[in-house]
C-alpha cells in the first residue's frame, strides 16, 4: 500500500507542471471593420490580451483585444483583416499581453514593424521577453537629463543642444530632407564626456556605450533601402537596431512599431547600460494609424478627425525617454514628424510640442535656397539645453555664444525685411554688418555637407569666426571676461 502511495505521488510530481487547460478555439466572428474584428461569445476576455488568429488557408496572424463588453471582444489585427471570415477563421485568446524578445544581439539587425527579422539572419535569441507598453517608472527615481549628445550638426549642437534623456522632435514637412538629417545624425551621433576641453574626448566611436534604435513607420521601399544602405556603408549599423514598417505593410502595425522600438531601447539602456538615441519617423504616419483605428471603432472624433485621446497616447510614447537613478544608461528621443501643409498648428505637432522638451524646425525657405540642413534656429528650441552645456560638459563660453548668435541672426532677419522696404542705400553701416552676418551665418554655419561631422568645439570656433565680424561693443550677450579670452579680431 505504501509503495502504491509513493508511485502515485511520483506520478503527480512529474505531471502536475505539464498539465494545463487547453485553449478554446472560437469561430464566432461577428463582424470585420477596417483593422478590427468583433468576436462574440468569448469566455472571460481580457483587455489588451493577445489573440492568435488562424485563417481558412492556414496562415496565422496576431491581434490584441482593444475593447471588452461582457462576452464580446473587439480585436485589432496587426497584419490586417483581409481574408478573415466567420466560417473558417479560428481565434485563440492567450491571456498574455503583447511582449517582444530583446537581446544585446539585436544591435546590427533589421526587423519589420512587428519585431521579426527581415535581414536574412536567424531569429533573436531572447535574453528576456518584455511588455511593449514598458515598465512603470517611479517619477521620484527619474534623474534630470544632463550632459550632451553630440549630433555633429552645428545648429543643433551649438544652439539647440540635446541632453541625454531628453525628448525633442524634428518638425518637418513633405518634400524636406528630414530623412537625410535623420541618417546624418545616426552616422555622427555620439557622447561628449565631462572634463575640461583638453581632456574631453568625442566618444562617438565608443560603441559599447552608445547605441541607436531607429524606427521607420509608413516609409516607402526607396526610403527603407536608403536607410539600410546608408547605415551599412558608414559603419553605424553595428550600433543600430533598425525597425522598418513599410507603406504597404498593414497600417495597424504602426501602432506597435514605436513601442517595440522603445522596449528594445529600454532594455539596452537600463539593463545593458547604454546611452540610447531613439529616432522615430514618421510620427504623422503613427497618428494617422491611430485615427484609422478610432474611426473603425466609431468613436467620437476630435480635431481633424483624430481621436480625443491622441494627446495621452502620444505621451505614452514620448514619456519613455529619460534617465533612472542608479542606472547607467539613458534614452534620448528624437521623433520626426511631417506637418501637413506646413501647418505647425496641426493637432500632431501641436500636441507633440506640449509633451516634448522643445523642437527643431526644418524650414522650407532655407531648403529652397539650397541650404542643408535647412534648420531654422529662430522657431527651434531646446528646453533642457542649459543642463547639457557649459564648463565641464562642453565649453564655458557655449551659452553666451549661442545667445549672441540668436540675437544677431534675429536682428539680421529684421534688417533684411527693412531692406526690402527702404532699399540698401537707407541702411546704416551697422545694419550692413548684420546683413553680412545673416548671409555668412546661413552659408557657413547652418549649411554643412551631408557627411561633414563637426565636433562641438569646431562649431563653437566657427561661431566665433562669424561673431568677429562685429566690434566688441555690439556683442552685448557675451561678458567682457569671455570677450577678452576668446575675441581675437583680425585687423586686416
Swiss-Prot record:
| UniProtKB keywords | Hydrogen ion transport, Ion transport, Transport
Q: This protein's superkingdom? A: Eukaryota
GO terms in the biological process aspect are: ATP metabolic process; vacuolar acidification
Q: Name one GO cellular component term.
A: proton-transporting V-type ATPase, V1 domain
| InterPro entries documented for this protein | ATP-synt_VA_C, ATPase_a/bsu_AS, ATPase_F1/V1/A1_a/bsu_N, ATPase_F1/V1/A1_a/bsu_nucl-bd, ATPase_V1-cplx_bsu, P-loop_NTPase, V-ATPase_su_B/beta
GO molecular function list: ATP binding; proton-transporting ATPase activity, rotational mechanism
Enumerate the CDD domains for this protein: ATP-synt_V_A-type_beta_C, ATP-synt_V_A-type_beta_N, V_A-ATPase_B
**Matching PROSITE patterns:** ATPASE_ALPHA_BETA
Keyword set includes Transmembrane helix: no
Matching Pfam families: ATP-synt_ab, ATP-synt_ab_N, ATP-synt_VA_C
Family assignment?
Belongs to the ATPase alpha/beta chains family.
Subunit annotation: V-ATPase is a heteromultimeric enzyme composed of a peripheral catalytic V1 complex (main components: subunits A, B, C, D, E, and F) attached to an integral membrane V0 proton pore complex (main component: the proteolipid protein).
Q: What is the stated purpose of this protein? A: Non-catalytic subunit of the peripheral V1 complex of vacuolar ATPase. V-ATPase is responsible for acidifying a variety of intracellular compartments in eukaryotic cells.
Question: Which protein are we looking at?
Answer: V-type proton ATPase subunit B 1
